[in-house]
Amino acid sequence: MSFLRTHLRWGVVALLFFTALLNNLDRMVLSVLAPTLKTDLAFGDVEYSYVVSAFLAAYAIGYTFCGKVLDRVGVKLGMMGALVFWSVAGMGHAAAVGWLSLAAFRFLLGLGESFNSPGGVKAVAEWIPRRERGLCMAVFSNGNVLGSIIAPPLVTFLLLHLGWRWAFVITGGLGIVLWAVWRHVYHSPERHPRLTDEERAVIMADRTGGSRRCATESADARQRVPPGIFALLRQPKCAGFFVARLLTDPIVYFFTFWLFSYLKEARNFSDMMIAAVGWIPFLASDVGGPGGGALSDWLVRRGWRPRSARLALMLFAACMMPVAILAVLTPNAWLAIACIALILGSQSCWMANQLTLISESVPRTHVATLLALSALGGSIGGIAANLLAGRAIHAAGYVPVFCALGFCHITAFTVLVLTGRKGVSNG
């Protein structure tokens, strides 16, 4: 307790972690229930891809304005509103009577959930000193991963004992509980009633670039940046983040929505086997994010420039991705599981450092807008990849899809290096 009294910022990180966990849990309910829903609501794989795309399309639309909303109303009001919205939408899935109504509720869920990542990154930028951001961003990001781990056993339990409609109601209702926690717990550092003067001084000193080592990058980040999301897109450095996530986020979406189908169709796993091992790759992701974030923070403390430290870990993660080719070609199903685990662990390392890099690239007041821009790219890439993957799998199986995703991160890393050579211009 004494640690929390003097390190209240870690309590904020814990709140962000559980918010991210619930965010992805609500998203994963559909993936776990998909076989049952296809039978009960009488639709097939093509319609299922449309339902998935409705969510991703709403995600993309939400990213065009959620950053601006968060920058204007603040983290607390923005996240509380989003929590209520996506929780009600999640519970609404229980009223679906066909794939069209399911897609409609899925669209609303995507709009609300689009606030989570920009809001979390903005909160980290407000509360966390730069030297700690890599680990904190990884902890926040891994809330999503834990949601993926919890979803299969929890949702299956609810399905077997209460039915699929109650599974949506109960998981969605958890958001209302979390809304109450946000209302009573979260405040900005300037206004938090339980923040010690010592910790407040540490947070505020970091905002002014108190470390000489970071002076140059802090000055660059404080340049005037056009606040509009599409104005940011005209800046090469910001456009680089957009393209990078357009190329790499589809890997997460692919395994989120198609992994269970791959294991059943290509590896002949039974439903019980999928329930028993389907969470393992996501557990690996839960290790890769904090590990990559902590290591980049260690490099910063050793004297590396923050940007160089984040990029070094991202390059390492990118070099792991071609193992996807081995995953799809090996006849050993368990080796395939191990390869997929390595892919998701590396993706988590990449994402943790990418989010940290974004938070350090523009003024604190515009972090959410830039994060929303980059995430918009991820959603657009996810929509395109989902539709293309469905057609490719139908025509040629999973081999071309796995081979393509093995090289997305190397391409994205090249884009980030080329577009990041200059700072953000003044407009």
Give each language-model segment a name.
Residues G11-D45, N116, F255-F260:
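Extracytoplasmic
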Residues L30-S31, L233-G292, M351, L355:
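Extracytoplasmic gate region of multi-pass secondary transporters
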Residues A42, G74, A95-S101, G112, ...:
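Helix-breaking motifs and short loop linkers at transmembrane-helix boundaries and internal kinks
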Residues S53-K68, W279-G292:
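Central cavity-lining transmembrane alpha-helices of secondary-active solute carriers
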Residues I61-L100:
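Conserved MFS/SLC helix-loop-helix module at the cytosolic interface between two early adjacent transmembrane helices
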Residues L77-M91, R307-I325, G406:
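Structural signature of the two symmetry-related core transmembrane helices
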Residues F140-P193:
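Helix-loop-helix hairpin linking two adjacent transmembrane segments in secondary transporters
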